[in-house]
């Protein structure tokens, strides 16, 4: 299993991307990594960690990097040798099995589209983010690839999300919900209203109707379907809420009496367990579903821990043949069966 890493992507590259790759290789004997980017910088980090001669770690030179503030389309046209582009080409040319792309989400999506192409029947790929809930994990998609979706895009997302949830959650018939401002089928904007009856009439997904934002942390369904604008707002709010609540608890304890501090010590193990369960860094990243290859988008602020996890998830998705499952699903039903352009 060989994974291509955009070693120059993200706020802490290349240090954290390289360290995370080292950790993944050390922990998984079947994984090899190809670090794409500035050879000298990458080699220096490998050498400092006694991994410069590891046969399962190689370096592939890329002379350019796409920054977080650059326009994705323009950057890809100007920077043909950008690390994310080169990493994607390694999968396209069958030299690697998957890509890990921290950094600019827009650039990553564009690189995947141009480099790998779309699966037949998919108009737009979606980012499928695992969301921690009280009952486990819920897959939310789209969480940032497309800000203006049509009903057909949401339908395609529901199909891909259902297949992903089967692999991720191990559920034979995962439940699917459409994110809306109310549970009634008559509520919502034009896109959601048009999407509802299509999902309701499909036999290959277990559609449970509309859900509201408050239902997500409850784990009401296994798959939450929404457009990328709404999904990204929900995702960022959830990340900020966990951080804010954690700080609020700490501040309250420090400002409390000696009895409050003693009580905090007693519940500390439970609080740490809860914090770990809600920590988005535990998930590593999110797959971009709908392109012809396993493509993991990692958080721009990813540290070594998240990179390692993203690599392991990517390896698992390749082994479980997620791309093949999506192709088969799109051939059976879904966007190929319905004649709609709205």
What are these regions (language model features)?
Residues 113-126, 132-140, 220-224, 228-340:
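Glycine-rich phosphate/nucleotide-binding loop
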Residues 4-15, 145-155, 297-304:
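Short, glycine-rich nucleotide/cofactor-binding loops
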Residues 15-16, 28-34, 40, 147-209, ...:
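Glycine-rich phosphate/diphosphate-binding loop of Rossmann-like nucleotide-binding domains
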Residues 50-96:
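Phosphate/nucleotide-donor binding subsite
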């Amino acid at each position: 299993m060989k994974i291509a890493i955009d070693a120059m992507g993200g706020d802490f590259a290349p240090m954290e991307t390289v360290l995370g790759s080292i950790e993944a290789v050390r922990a998984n004997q079947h994984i090899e990594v190809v670090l794409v980017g500035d050879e000298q910088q990458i080699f220096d980090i490998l050498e400092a960690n006694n991994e410069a001669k590891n046969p399962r770690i190689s370096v592939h030179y890329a002379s350019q990097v796409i920054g977080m503030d650059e326009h994705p389309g323009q950057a890809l046209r100007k920077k043909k040798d950008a690390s994310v582009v080169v990493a994607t080409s390694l999968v396209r040319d069958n030299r690697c099995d998957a890509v890990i792309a921290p950094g600019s989400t827009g650039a990553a999506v564009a690189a995947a589209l141009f480099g790998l192409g779309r699966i037949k029947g998919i108009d737009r790929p979606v980012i499928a983010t695992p969301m921690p809930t009280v009952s486990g994990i819920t897959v939310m998609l789209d969480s940032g690839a497309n800000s203006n979706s049509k009903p057909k895009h949401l339908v395609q997302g529901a199909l891909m999300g259902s297949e992903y949830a089967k692999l991720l959650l191990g559920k034979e018939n995962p439940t699917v919900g459409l994110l809306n401002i109310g549970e009634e089928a008559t509520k919502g904007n034009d896109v959601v209203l048009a999407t509802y009856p299509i999902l309701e009439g499909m036999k290959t997904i277990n559609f449970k109707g509309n859900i509201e934002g408050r239902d997500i942390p409850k784990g009401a369904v296994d798959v939450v379907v929404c457009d990328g604008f709404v999904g990204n707002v929900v995702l960022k709010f959830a990340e900020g809420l966990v951080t804010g609540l954690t700080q609020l608890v700490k501040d309250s304890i420090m400002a409390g009496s000696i009895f409050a501090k003693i009580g905090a010590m007693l519940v500390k193990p439970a609080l740490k367990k809860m914090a770990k369960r809600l920590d988005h860094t535990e998930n590593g990243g999110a797959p971009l579903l709908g392109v012809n290859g396993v493509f993991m988008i990692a958080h721009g602020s990813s540290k070594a821990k998240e990179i390692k996890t993203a690599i392991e998830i990517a390896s698992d998705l390749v082994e479980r043949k997620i791309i093949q499952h999506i192709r088969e699903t799109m051939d059976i039903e879904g966007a190929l069966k319905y004649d709609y352009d709205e």
